[in-house]
Amino acid sequence: MPRAYETMLIVRPDLSDEPLEQLLSSQEAILRENGVTHVEITNRGKRRFAGFEMKKFKEGLYIQFNYEAEPNAVAAWEKNLRINESVLRHMTLRVG
């Protein structure tokens, strides 16, 4: 039975609009290929990190994904996120 998840991505702040849209659409396509439904993507904007750097960046662009998925689909997507150069960090939570 699918469960509700929320994944927050922190992506490189130097991505322009077109590469960012390509990144988001490719990530949504990967989710849908794994049987994920009800995908909502919210751009939370650029934020400065609190006194530290991530891969030499002092700020990042926060993108929130809300979706319903099976646990194995989430694991497959997270594997893809770990190797993506544009994603600085990510975290997934099960909600509900």
Swiss-Prot record:
Keywords: Ribonucleoprotein, Ribosomal protein, RNA-binding, rRNA-binding. InterPro entries: Ribosomal_bS6, Ribosomal_bS6_sf, Ribosomal_S6_plastid/chlpt, Transl_elong_EF1B/ribsomal_bS6. GO terms for molecular function: small ribosomal subunit rRNA binding; structural constituent of ribosome. Signal peptide: none annotated. One of its GO terms (biological process) is translation. Transmembrane segments: none annotated. PANTHER family: MITOCHONDRIAL 28S RIBOSOMAL PROTEIN S6, SMALL RIBOSOMAL SUBUNIT PROTEIN BS6M. This is Small ribosomal subunit protein bS6. The gene is rpsF.
